[in-house]
Amino acid sequence: MTKRTSAKYKIDRRMGENIWGRPKSPVNRREYGPGQHGQRRKGKMSDFGLQLRAKQKLKGYYGDLTEKQFRRIYGEAERVKGDTGENLIGLLERRLDAVVYRAKFVPTVFAARQFVNHGHVLVNGKRVNIPSYRVKEGDVIEVRERSKQLASVLEAVSLAERDVPDYLEVDHSKMTATFVRTPHLGDVPYAVVMEPNLVVEYYAKN
């Protein structure tokens, strides 16, 4: 098992949920957490526990972001007009690695980060190797010509369990994606329930 594969399954086990909806997730086979005490019945979670869990789930979903990275994004969401939770989702979905994952250019968000880091992605015709790069409406994201036949790309395109959301216009024959608009929470095809409102509550108290 690769380090990236291990990381994503570790997050699933930690959360006790198959947060990316992957068929091979270990939580599909059991309903308890990792470790020797994982089978003990869980008590009712406190409000703080629910808020912390919501934050950890979102951080994990986008590639196990560090607290510093996530807190910075949250701070931006807080400063923008509108609902902070919705703003947070919009900013996370505008990350280049998130767009590469959503477009089904790679099979996992971890692979998306590496894919961008290694220079396989162009934005408006220019190579961008920063996973946190923030795309704008109308930006065209594409896989470099020499990277289109990589095994990870071919695997991702064939994945039936993942749909491309309607805020992207994707042409897999050309391996291009246009970022049409910033999504709202209800637009994002999460495999599990995400609760950014609880993240807002968490940071309001901590």
Swiss-Prot record:
How is the quaternary structure described? Part of the 30S ribosomal subunit. Contacts protein S5. The interaction surface between S4 and S5 is involved in control of translational fidelity.
Q: Which GO terms describe its biological process?
A: ribosomal small subunit biogenesis; translation
Which GO terms of the molecular function aspect are on file?
rRNA binding; structural constituent of ribosome
Kindly indicate whether the keyword Ribonucleoprotein belongs to this entry: yes
Its function, per the record, reads: One of the primary rRNA binding proteins, it binds directly to 16S rRNA where it nucleates assembly of the body of the 30S subunit. With S5 and S12 plays an important role in translational accuracy.
**Which parts of the sequence are annotated with region: Disordered?**
18-45
| Name under which the protein is recorded | Small ribosomal subunit protein uS4
Q: Which family does it belong to?
A: Belongs to the universal ribosomal protein uS4 family.
Keywords (alphabetical) are: Ribonucleoprotein, Ribosomal protein, RNA-binding, rRNA-binding
Q: Where is the S4 RNA-binding domain?
A: 94-157
**Would you name any one GO CC term?**
small ribosomal subunit
Taxonomic superkingdom: Bacteria
Q: Which PROSITE patterns match?
A: RIBOSOMAL_S4 (PS00632), S4 (PS50889)
